[in-house]
């Protein structure tokens, strides 16, 4: 299903790049501000979640874990005390990212280890951590009121990975809301309007009896089309941008798009 045009080395690099950009978004922001796209979190909660996830993945990769690692077994998982201030939080984020990137590089692609997914290797974690950081950086930028931008290839890969995750959830958790994304032959077309010629920027998602199928192709006859610049398209697909407004355009049956977005979840 996935394109996965990005290399393992690129993912390793992005762990520190995306963390650095996240730290920039947090610098000087009110860490007690609520995150509109994750309303149960403050900005500090988001930072601790991301930093803890980074250290958790690092521990799995570093130890070549054969089973899930509990949070309490991860050094400094919970982050520094609040009273230590934003400088300590920033340093903790930076150190965790550097350690995770180093562990991934040392492991190399395809190294066998536990994951919660269909792919039991370091390659899964390199990609998953990159996209975890990218999307939560968007959350942080929205909360801090600063601009968010993403490389088009990285944003397209975020869409690809999300589709893989939703398909996996359908297979292993059939009672999950994602299980309702099947049947009827309805189609959802995603169209990045700023994609360069030959670049990956279109997805045709078709509901089938077994779930859904994805093809990288254009159509003018989809049940609904979501279109816009690649970054905004990705954010809307991840429910980080509203479907109203000027950022993206919906053509066709909006209710089907909303049906998809409400059920394309996991966790």
Language-model features, listed with the residues they occupy:
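Hydrophobic alpha-helical segments and helix pairs
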Residues: 89-137
């Amino acid at each position: 299903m996935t394109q996965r045009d990005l290399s393992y080395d690129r993912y390793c690099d992005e762990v520190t790049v995306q963390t650095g950009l996240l730290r920039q978004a947090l610098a000087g922001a009110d860490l007690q501000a609520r995150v509109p796209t994750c309303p149960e979190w403050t900005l500090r909660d988001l930072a601790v979640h991301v930093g803890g996830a980074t250290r958790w993945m690092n521990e799995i990769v570093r130890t070549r874990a054969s089973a899930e690692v509990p949070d309490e077994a991860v050094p400094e998982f919970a982050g520094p005390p609040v009273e230590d201030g934003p400088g300590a939080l920033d340093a903790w984020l930076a150190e965790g990212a550097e350690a995770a990137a180093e562990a991934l590089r040392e492991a190399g692609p395809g190294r066998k280890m536990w994951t919660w997914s269909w792919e039991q290797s370091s390659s899964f974690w390199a990609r998953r951590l990159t996209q975890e950081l990218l999307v939560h950086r968007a959350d942080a930028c929205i909360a801090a009121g600063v601009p968010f931008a993403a490389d088009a290839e990285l944003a397209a890969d975020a869409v690809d990975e999300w589709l893989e995750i939703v398909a996996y959830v359908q297979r292993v958790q059939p009672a999950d809301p994602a299980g309702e994304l099947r049947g009827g032959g309805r189609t959802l077309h995603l169209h990045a309007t700023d994609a360069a010629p030959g670049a990956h920027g279109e997805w045709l998602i078709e509901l089938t009896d077994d779930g859904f199928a994805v093809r990288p192709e254009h159509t003018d006859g989809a049940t609904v089309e979501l279109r816009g610049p690649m970054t905004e398209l990705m954010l809307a697909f991840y429910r980080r941008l509203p479907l109203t407004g000027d950022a993206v355009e919906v053509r066709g049956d909006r209710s089907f798009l909303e049906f998809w977005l409400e059920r394309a979840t996991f966790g």
